[in-house]
Amino acid sequence: MVPETKSFQLEIGGKTVTVETGKYAQSTNGSVTVRCGDTMLFVHCVVSKEPRVGIDFFPLLIDYEERMSSIGRIPGGYNRSEGKASDKAILVSRLIDRPIRPLFPKGYRNDIQIVAQLFSYDQQNQPDTLAMLGASCALMLSGAPFEGPIGAVRVSKVDGQLIANPTHQQADKSDLDIVVAGTHDSVIMVEAGCKFVTEDDIMEAVEFAQGEIRKQCEAQVEFAKACGVVKEEFVNPYDTTELKNIINEVAHDMIFDAYHNFDRKYRQEKLEEAKKLVKEKVEALPEDHYIHKIIEETGIDFVAEEFKAAEKKIMRAMILDEGVRADGRKPTEVRPIWCEVGVIPRAHGSAVFTRGQTQILSVATLAGPGMKQELDGVDPETEKTYMHKYIFPGFSVGEVKPLRGPGRREVGHGNLAERANVPALPSQEEFGYTIRVTSDVLESNGSTSMGSTCGSSMALMNAGVPVKCMIGGVAMGMITEEGKEPVVLTDIQGIEDFLGDMDFKVTGNDDGITALQMDMKAKGIANDTLRRALAQAKEGRLHILGEMRKVITEPAKQLSPFAPSISTMTIPTEDIGTVIGPGGKQIRAIIDASGAEIDIQDSGVVTITSNDQEGAAIAKKMIKDLTFKPEVGMVIKGKVVRIIPIGAFVELGGGKDGMVHISQICQERIETIEPHVNIGDEVIVKVIKIDDKGRINLTIKGVTEEDKAKLNA
């Protein structure tokens, strides 16, 4: 018997989105299918029955999976399986996580996993915002204490019109590609890649998105009611009032003093001293005291948790009431900046960007087209010629930590800095190199992704990449309290990120925005505050760009001597197979002989990448020889390879030779060819005839001075 299903439909951007539950994955707490066109996802939510012991964070796990079968393909690779999550899948997982995480009550420790699986993809209707909608629906059905629902929509502007959930083709045409997520009355998350759009363009898109988000939220509320969902009422079972009183009594003044001294080292030492006194006070309590019991029962360090809450309260009060930040800055002030370029001797381009106690080393490397990244995914894009990698080692924050591959955070930060600089890059026609930039965090105290954006831009310029402009970035924060005007902070440091209500990153040049990422820790941001944050971010960005220009103002005129050189030539398309040879034999021979990298496009454009001019010249000559086709009237320099009584055979290239009849060697009549022409001589000949059998007749005496001049030119 087919199970009973419940569903609802929405109209988003002129397309119908259908959400259905009841048929699949009945062992989950909530499971839905989401479909738009022929793009369909299964989204599942599982909630543990008991809270996890011994953790001080909310254990939410989001996994987004793309199946190659969704586009009718078998995965590449030896095992023909999907393997580990791609960067794209990680970015979508983060996209789902970020607007959901703030909407769970403090102290909730039950494990929640959301799995979004893409099973069908029409390569028109993009799956990421559908996965976000599905995750919210699954949570609403799960009964978990989720303070949603949320809606999510992508917005692009095509021909002056804003479009909700555009197709890939529409988004590619647009200067604006923005994803907005939020509740029925506020924005929680924004993610954007732009081509120098204004702050007003961003606000217009956000306000447009909110109308679509409200529709999604209202539909989900009705959907949950129709499914008879009873939401769990979560009340934090652990009363820490007495512990708060102890901290207030023992440590309040010390914390206050620590935050009013703007030396970071002094503050850390003072806070450690205060925390030690609190712990001693707690340890002196009777063994059967309630505080000892809840710490033993849960494994949670409530002392550290409540101490951090006391820090947060004092730091936020300083900003809200005094207008002073933890390092003494005003809300709109940027930390001191210094930069340098060309710091790595053999790198093609390098830069160090330092802002306060955040320091980034960015290194640019240039390579030929053959080093482009092949994308074996479900999206229409198949390759990348610009890549940015963000590396965050433990030593940057003074910690001992093993060096591993990039985690989700590193992938997200690297992608943001990559998107920030892409609009400033030249086209492949203008600059045919593949470019990779690595940004190593040498020291971290907040805003490392924005430091990577700035460092990358300067490294590209130092490498001689003809970028359109310099790109800078700034991270904004916000402090809120009910009944008070929110304070927007420019260039947040680590503690303001950790204890604040917003992390809002904006990148661009003097005129417009290239990338944007906003995450709220509070339950949303009002539009007027968002508008103010964008305006304040522009002021900060312009200041940062001014500091960067003190070091470098334009791309280097010449590439590094250690960078490869690129040259191009065009061959007839019918000769591509000849140059490649059977099984690639011929092109491998060219690569082995020249040491150059050869890339041949379907149009016949051949790109030769070599570390020296000699290698490039060898490759060019070999390709020219292979594609050589003599024509009547063509003047060629060749070598005499054989002599017979009636003439001399001259090698023309490409495995072809022709014969100079004895009568075509000298102006006067001669009886013997030698000594006029000898084997091994280089001679200039002109093609005078090609017969039906392809035999080539040449002349030496018919070559004029004008012919020789053209050949030498």
Predicted regions, residues:
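Extended amphipathic alpha-helical scaffolds
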Residues: 1-48, 232-380, 564-578, 586, ...
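Glycine-rich, flexible beta-strand/loop modules in the N-terminal catalytic cores of phosphate-handling
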Residues: 16, 28-113, 118-125, 184, ...
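Conserved phosphate/anionic-ligand binding catalytic regions in large, soluble enzymes, centered on
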Residues: 30-32, 40, 125-143, 341-364, ...
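Flexible, glycine/charged-enriched surface loops at secondary-structure junctions
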Residues: 106-112, 147-149, 216-234, 287-297, ...
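Short, hydrophobic beta-strand segments
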Residues: 116-118, 188-193, 234-238, 249-260, ...
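Mobile "lid/hinge" segments at catalytic clefts and subdomain interfaces of large enzymes
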Residues: 143-262, 460-557
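Long, charged amphipathic helices and adjacent flexible linkers at domain junctions
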Residues: 234-241, 543-569, 617-637
